[in-house]
From Swiss-Prot:
It comes from Pyrococcus abyssi (strain GE5 / Orsay). Residues 1-25 are annotated as: Disordered. Residues 1-24 have a biased composition (Basic residues). Pfam families: Ribosomal_L21e. This is Large ribosomal subunit protein eL21. Belongs to the eukaryotic ribosomal protein eL21 family.
Amino acid sequence: MVQKAHSFRRKTRKKLRKHPRRRGLPPLTRFLQEFEVGQRVHIVIEPSYHKGMPDPRFHGRTGTVVGKRGDAYIVEVPDGNKVKTLFIHPVHLRPQK
């Protein structure tokens, strides 16, 4: 009998898909983005870069930058009645306008 996969990227067939013209890595400016503490950011996963990638359930969520650890930013995201703390690489973040 087969077992269901419990991998990190399961159920993300459409969520982590890129448009064919956008294939490959994004521009370097996305890697070198700077955010300030208290700034609101959107979590938009970049599927071609795996380091510092948050769980796909947080794709599309908005959080607040709390600090920095190495290259990654510490982002707090409300999840129901709790506030989750995530360590996310800046390539997976976009500033809120």
